[in-house]
């Protein structure tokens, strides 16, 4: 039986995600390893995330082991920056792929790494879930959810072993939001960008999963 999994928006709304100021420069903000907080409401009691260091740079290391309950880390965008952030950049690398994990297949929805990007308009939360899949097809969008309070799409951003190398990503927030939630309308209003989440898991496939997450840069 597939394991029920809430949307990140639900976690973000109801959990205690602390707002911690990110390191700032003139045109961007850096969300460092120390800024992430456990999203408590739907996370298990044991966090499998640690802060590691490579070449003097701290990063988040996720090491999920079978039997653990899934844990999500979150970062809440400061109120004054929610309309100012234009792009999100990050680096990640898959270390251990969950056995046969594919977020687009019911009952196999585990990922080596996940990045959630969330906006809010009124009472409705919009989330794009970018995953590093074990076997899923890169570029595929699936598991779409739409109701009066939540809209969410899952996008397979990367798939398969990465050879232990860091991979850089950049998401244009307005473009991504309009493409997924406004049918590509270039004039559609983009609501406030309110939060980011990260997760590695293997609970559905009952297998190990591991990944590293470097600093996130929020470009104003």
Residue ranges and their predicted role:
Residues 1-11:
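Bacterial N-terminal signal peptides that target proteins for export
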Residues 9-20:
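Bacterial N-terminal signal peptides
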Residues 25-44:
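Extracellular carbohydrate-recognition regions
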Residues 50-70:
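Short carbohydrate-recognition loop motifs
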Residues 75-88, 160-163, 187-189:
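Extracellular/lumenal carbohydrate-interaction signature centered on repeated Trp-anchored short motifs
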Residues 107-115, 159, 163-208:
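Extracellular beta-strand ligand-recognition surfaces/modules
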Residues 196, 215-218:
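Extracellular beta-strand elements of beta-rich domains used
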């Amino acid at each position: 039986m597939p394991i029920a999994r809430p949307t990140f928006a639900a976690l973000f709304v109801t959990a205690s995600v602390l707002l911690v100021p990110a390191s700032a420069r003139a045109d961007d903000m850096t969300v460092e390893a120390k800024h992430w907080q456990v999203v408590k409401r739907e996370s298990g009691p044991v966090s499998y995330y640690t802060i590691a260091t490579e070449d003097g740079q701290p990063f988040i290391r996720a090491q999920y082991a079978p039997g653990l309950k899934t844990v999500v880390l979150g970062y809440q965008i400061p109120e004054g920056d929610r309309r100012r952030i234009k792009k999100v950049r990050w680096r990640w690398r898959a270390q251990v792929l969950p056995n046969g994990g594919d977020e687009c297949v019911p009952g196999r929805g585990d990922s080596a790494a996940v990045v959630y990007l969330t906006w809010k308009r009124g009472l409705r939360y919009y989330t794009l879930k970018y995953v590093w899949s074990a076997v899923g097809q890169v570029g595929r969008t699936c598991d779409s959810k739409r109701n009066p309070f939540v809209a969410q799409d899952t996008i397979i951003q990367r798939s398969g072993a990465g050879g232990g190398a860091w991979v850089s990503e950049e998401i244009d927030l307005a473009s991504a939001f309009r493409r997924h939630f406004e049918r590509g309308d270039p004039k559609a209003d983009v609501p406030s960008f309110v939060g980011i989440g990260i997760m590695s898991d293997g609970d559905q496939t009952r297998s190990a999963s591991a990944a590293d997450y470097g600093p996130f840069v929020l470009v104003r």
